[in-house]
């Protein structure tokens, strides 16, 4: 398949009490909390890129043509941001889980953050290893604050290029133009995660066989332009706009022709994130 069509990344407590911490300052006071993540550790951190292109015949899933363009683009982009980039190709579901477990057990104490990019087929709540599905929640749980202590309080970014269902977006016409004194603070184990999904829940995610996926193209372009100027959520907003306004599917199948896409950002970050300091 090299006819420059766009493709999709899918598979063919009852009682409780509240506790008040007396004498504590309001989170809005700014007295105890810095407004942005500390990004001046000796290393920016790891960037793991899982690039699944070829799938076992038994899965019935097609090759993801164009994904190597995404992987190369991501590698260049995050290396420019001083991340240690590790590319992994065509991993089974077992290999993905083993990789995440292994990486989470590394010493990240000298690293400012962690990034994991997954390029694969997907469905809602799962991404696919080359031999079958992986529950995304299980995959990311290795990096929770109670499991990966050396990343506690640091930003953990998961970037997912995969379908989240089989709905199609036809579009609509528009007429409108951590410091030492914080060492004892307790934080939720799910804090400081950000999930950047290529598409909204339930929808297809589009990929071009020549240029790569719309989302990864846009993410890399916006990071190259703004990583040294803007906060990360502001960058992602620009990614959303670029995907939403500059791309439309082309397919010989009328069902899949002239469709749109909007990325979806789920943030549990507790501070602003800048890739510079």
UniProtKB/Swiss-Prot annotation:
Modified how: Cleavage by granzyme B, caspase-6, caspase-8 and caspase-10 generates the two active subunits. Additional processing of the propeptides is likely due to the autocatalytic activity of the activated protease. Active heterodimers between the small subunit of caspase-7 protease and the large subunit of caspase-3 also occur and vice versa.
Tissues in which the protein is found: Expressed in heart, brain, liver, and muscle but not in kidney or testis.
Sequence positions bearing S-nitrosocysteine: 163
Active-site annotation: 121, 163
Modification Phosphoserine, positions: 26
Alphabetized Pfam families for the sequence: Peptidase_C14
GO biological process: anterior neural tube closure; apoptotic process; axonal fasciculation; B cell homeostasis; cell fate commitment; cellular response to staurosporine; DNA damage response; epithelial cell apoptotic process
GO MF term (any one): phospholipase A2 activator activity
Keyword Hydrolase: yes
UniProt EC number: 3.4.22.56
EC supergroup of this enzyme: hydrolase
Regulation of its function: Inhibited by BIRC6; following inhibition of BIRC6-caspase binding by DIABLO/SMAC, BIRC6 is subjected to caspase cleavage, leading to an increase in active caspases.
Source organism superkingdom: Eukaryota
Catalysed conversion reaction: Strict requirement for an Asp residue at positions P1 and P4. It has a preferred cleavage sequence of Asp-Xaa-Xaa-Asp-|- with a hydrophobic amino-acid residue at P2 and a hydrophilic amino-acid residue at P3, although Val or Ala are also accepted at this position
Keyword Ubl conjugation found: yes
Keywords: Acetylation, Apoptosis, Cytoplasm, Hydrolase, Phosphoprotein, Protease, S-nitrosylation, Thiol protease, Ubl conjugation, Zymogen
PANTHER family: CASPASE (PTHR10454), CASPASE-3 (PTHR10454:SF198)
Function: Involved in the activation cascade of caspases responsible for apoptosis execution. At the onset of apoptosis, it proteolytically cleaves poly(ADP-ribose) polymerase PARP1 at a '216-Asp-|-Gly-217' bond. Cleaves and activates sterol regulatory element binding proteins (SREBPs) between the basic helix-loop-helix leucine zipper domain and the membrane attachment domain. Cleaves and activates caspase-6, -7 and -9 (CASP6, CASP7 and CASP9, respectively). Cleaves and inactivates interleukin-18 (IL18). Triggers cell adhesion in sympathetic neurons through RET cleavage.
Similarity field: Belongs to the peptidase C14A family.
Protein name: Caspase-3
Gene from which the chain derives: Casp3
């Amino acid at each position: 398949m090299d006819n420059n069509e766009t493709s999709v990344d899918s598979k063919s407590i009852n009682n409780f009490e509240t506790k008040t911490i007396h004498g504590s300052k309001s989170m809005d006071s700014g007295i105890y909390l810095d407004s942005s993540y500390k990004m001046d550790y000796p290393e920016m951190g790891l960037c793991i890129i899982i690039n699944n292109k070829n799938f076992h015949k038994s899965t019935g899933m097609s090759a993801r043509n164009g994904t190597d363009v995404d992987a190369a683009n991501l590698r260049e982009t995050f290396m420019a941001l001083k991340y240690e980039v590790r590319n992994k190709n065509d991993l089974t579901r077992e290999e993905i889980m083993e990789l995440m477990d292994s990486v989470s057990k590394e010493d990240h104490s000298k690293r400012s953050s962690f990034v994991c990019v997954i390029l694969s087929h997907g469905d809602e709540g799962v991404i696919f290893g080359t031999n079958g599905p992986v529950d995304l929640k299980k995959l990311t749980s290795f990096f929770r604050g109670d499991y990966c202590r050396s990343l506690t309080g640091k930003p953990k970014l998961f970037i997912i290029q995969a379908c989240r269902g089989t709905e199609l977006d036809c579009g609509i016409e528009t007429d409108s133009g951590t410091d030492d004194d914080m060492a004892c603070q307790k934080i939720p184990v799910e804090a400081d995660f950000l999930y950047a999904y290529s598409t909204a829940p339930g929808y297809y995610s589009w990929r071009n066989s020549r240029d790569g996926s719309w989302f990864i193209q846009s993410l890399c372009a916006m990071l190259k332009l703004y990583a040294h100027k803007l906060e990360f959520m502001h960058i992602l907003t620009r990614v959303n706009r670029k995907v939403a306004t500059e791309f439309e599917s082309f397919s010989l199948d009328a069902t899949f022709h002239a469709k749109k896409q909007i990325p979806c950002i789920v943030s549990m970050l507790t501070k602003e994130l800048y890739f510079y300091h």
